[in-house]
Amino acid sequence: DAALVVLDAVDGPQIGTARAWKLSKERGIPRFGLVNRLDRERADFKATLEQMRKNHGKNVIIPLYWPVGAEANFSRVVNVLFDKEIPAEIADDVAECRGLWLDAIAETDDDLMMRYLDGEELSDDEIREGLKKTVKTGRTIPVFAGSSTKDVGITELMDAIIELFPSPLNYVTVDGAKRKIGDECDAIGIVFKVLNDPFSGQLTFVRTVSGTFQADSDVYNLSRPGVKERFGSLLFMNGKNQTPVKSAGPGTIFACAKLKDTHIGDTVAVNAGETPLP
């Protein structure tokens, strides 16, 4: 669907960060960047931003939200396109980002570009629609500022995911066919994470794409012909806490213990005749 790459405002991009950018670019999916932990000592939004821009370019990596305050004084974020009351100390940075966004948005439509070059102001609706287009094509990567522990900037990020990322209802299979999504469909999902838990052993994380998986049921690994697995308890994860559930419907993320031959990127389904997901 899309990718959210989380960057550390203290330590900057890591080896895994570069790999995440590379894989998401190869897939041709929309991408967001989140500069997290901005409330920590030595956190530096601008330095992290510049490190990203070294690899992708200033006209591609553009903050959509800019932080107000630094380290322990980090208190909120402002939208560079729509917020009007901007603190004086970040006004120049916000204005520069707004200009970069308007340039990118104007490029999504010839008529929009002509009017923009003639000095005409774009409406809020035109900006929103152009923003969706440029993010969808991957020509721009919005950057967000936040602190997950202080819950600053996270609501804005979640709202943007809903507004700008592709709808999960528009899912296609590996052969390009559009897939019907709904509770009434046969359950199918994709594995996105595997880890070893000291108490539960190997945990496999699955996102349900369509249908509803049930606890204590058999599933087929469509990515590995002939492989059949058994879902025992389905677990909702909240940090280290595990909550067993009986079922997991569309959009749900759950974990399952002790799968033997299922790996990251594999498609699992209750129907062996389904087509794997990309």
What are these regions (language model features)?
Residues D1-P278:
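Structural and coupling elements of P-loop NTPases
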